[in-house]
Amino acid sequence: MADIPPDPPALDTTPANHAPPSPLPGSRKRRRPVLPSSSESEGKPDIESESSSTESSEDEVGDLRGGRRRPPRELGGRYFLDLSAESTTGTESEGTGPSDDDDDDASDGWLVDTPPRKSKRPRINLRLTSSPDRRAGVVFPEVWRSDRPIRAAQPQAPAQSSGDRAHAPRRSARQAQMRSGAAWTLDLHYIRQCVNQ
């Protein structure tokens, strides 16, 4: 057996001078530029604060130009881009022509889905009239009626095939004539045919 030392250096729990843990890859914090006090500004300029301020402004410009945006806030189930957090510099907003913000939003995938507009169907107002008006030709004009006189005393003929559309207006007019004694009847099949023509 190998001899194990009683206090190996690997088990030493005293903290050594370690650097603080590095931040996670996505959570890089920007340093604020240090404002020089009045006594320091008279003497020499603060070189470190100038370099840190240029780094942070370059990071912001790089983030905006690279197409990266901050993730949207979620309020009540809807997503909103936090546009107040984004700042544009004077060089970007000067005379660059039309902005491509719409294209950037579409490529980033942060577009808010808007419901597609429903196309409105044309509204058709039908005037439904009682049977005396139907006989007078308000709903069924005289053009659609048959030329030969309608015989009301004849019993109704057996129903014709639905494929024969040439006789449909005659049949409807005949049925309207036969039902003229009824208080108020509708021939929905004929009305549909007239509307669809």
Curated annotation (Swiss-Prot):
Q: Does the keyword Phosphoprotein apply?
A: yes
UniProt biased composition (Basic and acidic residues)? 62-76
Q: Which InterPro entries match?
A: IE68
Assigned keywords, A-Z? Early protein, Host nucleus, Host-virus interaction, Inhibition of host innate immune response by virus, Inhibition of host interferon signaling pathway by virus, Inhibition of host STAT1 by virus, Inhibition of host STAT2 by virus, Interferon antiviral system evasion, Phosphoprotein, Transcription, Transcription regulation, Ubl conjugation pathway, Viral immunoevasion
Can the keyword Transcription be found in this entry's annotation?
yes
Q: Which pathway is this protein engaged in? A: Protein modification; protein ubiquitination
Q: Where is it located?
A: Host nucleus
Out of the domains of life, which is the source? Viruses
**Chief place of localization:** host cell
Pfam families xrefs: Herpes_IE68 (PF02479)
Gene Ontology BP terms: protein ubiquitination; regulation of gene expression; symbiont-mediated suppression of host innate immune response; symbiont-mediated suppression of host JAK-STAT cascade via inhibition of STAT1 activity; symbiont-mediated suppression of host JAK-STAT cascade via inhibition of STAT2 activity; symbiont-mediated suppression of host type I interferon-mediated signaling pathway
The segment annotated Disordered runs over 1-129, 147-178
Low complexity: compositionally biased ranges: 84-97
The post-translation modification note in this UniProt entry reads: Tyrosine phosphorylated.
Q: Name one GO cellular component term.
A: host cell nucleus
The entry's family comment says: Belongs to the herpesviridae ICP22 family.
Q: What else is known?
A: ICP22 and protein US1.5 mRNAs are transcribed from two different promoters on the US1 gene.
Sum up the protein's function in the record's words: Functions as an E3 ubiquitin ligase and plays a role in the inhibition of innate immunity by preventing IFN-mediated signaling. Induces the ubiquitination and degradation of host STAT1, STAT2 and IRF9, resulting in the blockade of ISGF3 nuclear translocation.
This protein is called what? E3 ubiquitin ligase ICP22
Q: Which organism is it from?
A: Human herpesvirus 2 (HHV-2)
The organism's taxonomy opens as: Viruses, Duplodnaviria, Heunggongvirae, Peploviricota, Herviviricetes
In the UniProt record, the gene name given for this protein reads US1
